[in-house]
Amino acid sequence: MTTPLTLVIGNKTYSSWSMRPWLLLKHLGVDFQEIHVPLHAPDAAAQIARYSPSGRVPVLLDGDLRIWESLAISEYLAERYPAVWPIAAEARALARSVSSEMHAGFATLRNELPFNCRARRSGVTPSPTTRIEINRVVAIWENCRATGDAGGPWLFGGFTAADALFAPVALRFHTYGIA
């Protein structure tokens, strides 16, 4: 019997980076253990350092192998679970492109609209720079929906890593009433 994967994360309510691989693993139906590190605990850095060479979460443990960073975790999972990315090559390439953009971009949106998926904030007016980033996210989503399998509800029809990576943004939009 193989040891299940272990995902080391912070609180999914506040840590969008922790939420991403957790969502992906759940949607894939993968058996995994979860280690929750309270990120505001005095010893959080020491707890994380036990698992993560980068000193950050998330980290996926597979035996002695440690994979940190949500996009790297997604790619590692794709080696075992082909449903991580769309089947069609063009859609798969687009999914990887927009996932990489999500991972590396949208810093103003992240800073101006902090992640808390349980909160509801009203009266927040995004700055012009954040509005540009919001518009870019919406354009990405529209393009993915036009490219993917229209038969499913997700960005490319079926749930993929792109959905897991963009889910916290969708939740931010809900939190702040962004239309």
Positions of PLM-derived features:
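GST-like fold's C-terminal all-alpha helical module
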Residues: 106-179
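GST-like domain detector, emphasizing the conserved glutathione-binding G-site
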Residues: 1-127
